[in-house]
């Protein structure tokens, strides 16, 4: 379908329909009128023509099935362009007759609720998976955020402790090494107390 859309991108829709299905102009005009009514409705709802067509293609009921068949015929013709056009005419002649019936069956008032209903159906079908995935992603992301925050806070606390305690300990060790043990020895009367005092006297004050 994308290939067909790309090939026919530059052409107006009326020409696309006539060329792809190979119908006479009278039949094409009836179909174009039916399509223009359908295309105006999605535009009124603020949708582009492409979205309107895609939703119309997937629509349940007679019209959706017929359009799917028409799309298959288009694909078959685009793949094998050597086929004569007479093969596609019987199905294409039946198509415009059934389209007015479908248009009569559902007036413009019914069109909008069906679309809305189909949207909600799509939403309910897709929403459990999507919502679960979204919840899992959100949950994972929140867990990751908590872990990262926890890791960052722990790292900051450890850095603070190291800066406060570690730096202070190193300062104490530097201070304690020359002075404290000797002073303690001298005070306690442990052997070598005199040596410590001698060493203190021998060391020049800087």
UniProtKB/Swiss-Prot annotation:
Subcellular location: Nucleus
Chief localisation class: nucleus
The protein's role, per its UniProt record: May be involved in transcriptional regulation.
Ranges for region Disordered: 1-206
Protein name: Transcription elongation factor A protein-like 5
Bias (Basic and acidic residues): 1-26, 43-56, 71-86, 102-113, 121-160, 196-206
Organism: Homo sapiens
InterPro entries per UniProt: TF_A-like/BEX
One annotated Gene Ontology cellular component of this protein: nucleus
Record-stated family: Belongs to the TFS-II family. TFA subfamily.
Pfam families linked to this entry: BEX (PF04538)
UniProt lineage: Eukaryota, Metazoa, Chordata, Craniata, Vertebrata
Compositional bias segments (type: Acidic residues): 27-42, 57-70
Keywords of the record: Nucleus, Transcription, Transcription regulation
């Amino acid at each position: 379908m994308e290939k067909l859309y790309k090939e026919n991108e530059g052409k107006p829709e009326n020409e696309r329909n006539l060329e792809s299905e190979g119908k006479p102009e009278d039949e094409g005009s009836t179909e174009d009128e039916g399509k223009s009514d359908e295309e105006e409705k999605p535009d009124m709802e603020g949708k582009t023509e492409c979205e309107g067509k895609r939703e119309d293609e997937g629509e349940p009921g007679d019209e959706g099935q017929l359009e799917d068949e028409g799309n298959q015929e288009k694909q078959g013709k685009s793949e094998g362009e050597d086929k004569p056009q007479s093969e596609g005419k019987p199905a294409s002649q039946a198509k415009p007759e059934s389209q007015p019936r479908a248009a009569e069956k559902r007036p413009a008032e019914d069109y909008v609720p069906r679309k809305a209903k189909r949207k909600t159906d799509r939403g309910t079908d897709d929403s459990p998976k999507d919502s679960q995935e979204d919840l899992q992603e959100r949950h994972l992301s929140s867990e990751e955020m908590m872990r990262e925050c926890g890791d960052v806070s722990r790292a900051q606390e450890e850095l603070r402790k190291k800066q406060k305690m570690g730096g202070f300990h190193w300062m104490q060790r530097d201070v304690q090494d020359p002075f404290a043990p000797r002073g303690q020895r001298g005070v306690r009367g442990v052997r070598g107390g005199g040596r410590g005092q001698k060493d203190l006297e021998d060391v020049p004050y800087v």
